[in-house]
Design a protein with these regions (language model features):
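A cross-family phosphate/adenosyl-ligand binding-site feature
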Residues: 2-56, 60-61
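Short, Asp-centered acidic motifs that coordinate Mg2+ and/or phosphate
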Residues: 64
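Short beta-strand segments
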Residues: 7-8, 67-70, 101-102, 138-141
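Short glycine-rich anion-binding loops that position phosphate/pyrophosphate groups of nucleotides
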Residues: 11, 45-46, 70-73, 143
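Glycine/threonine-rich flexible loop motifs
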Residues: 73-82
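Alpha-helix C-terminal capping segments
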Residues: 53-59, 86-97
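Electrostatically charged, flexible surface regions
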Residues: 113-170
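Glycine-rich phosphate/pyrophosphate-binding loops
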Residues: 92-114
């Protein structure tokens, strides 16, 4: 199949499912690091990227939307403020299969192991009878290369959403 990347042009941590309402959103085609892959940078949120990619950039139906991979877990209630998971939620709401991928920390060596697992999961989503609108959230712990033994499904935990605020005066 054909792969197209439509992603925010900068970090969008904490944007959740937000869209750029009453604001301009710019899209630019950018050079790809992979032959045959078209890449677009969106000056907007991850959700904006999904909407623009699926409705305006791509001419065919989307088989699956992959969001991420980003450093830091998107587990429990934290996933609801995650831009990575937010993009997957919007894709699912638009009727596409979607999966958000996150990992505890970025490690160039472990990234190759994770890439193989992401490829396998993506292929399963495309080739299986996974219904349109299905939504998945996959988090990889920091483990040695080759340490991934499988994928386990679970419901999100119901932990407290803890946030800190650094108050400053003008």
């Amino acid at each position: 199949g054909e792969v197209t990347v439509v992603a925010p042009s900068g970090n969008q941590s904490g944007t959740g499912c937000s869209i750029s309402f009453r604001k301009s959103v710019n899209v630019n085609q950018v050079p790809s690091r992979v032959d045959g892959v078209n890449c677009f940078a969106v000056r907007g949120t991850p959700a904006d990227s999904v909407i623009l990619g699926s409705k305006y950039i791509l001419e065919e139906d989307v088989d699956v939307v992959i969001s991420g991979i980003n450093p830091g877990f998107n587990t429990s209630r934290n996933m609801f403020i995650s831009g990575t998971f937010g993009a997957a939620i919007i894709a699912s709401a638009l009727g596409m299969r979607a999966c958000a991928f996150s990992m505890d920390a970025v490690d160039p060596v472990d990234d190759f192991t994770v890439a193989n697992v992401i490829t396998a999961i993506t292929n399963e989503l495309i080739c299986s009878d996974t219904p349109p609108g299905s939504l998945f959230n996959v988090n990889f712990p920091t483990i040695p290369v080759g340490g991934i033994k499988g994928v386990e499904g679970c419901a999100p935990a119901r932990s407290e959403l803890k946030m800190t605020v650094d108050l400053q005066s003008d």
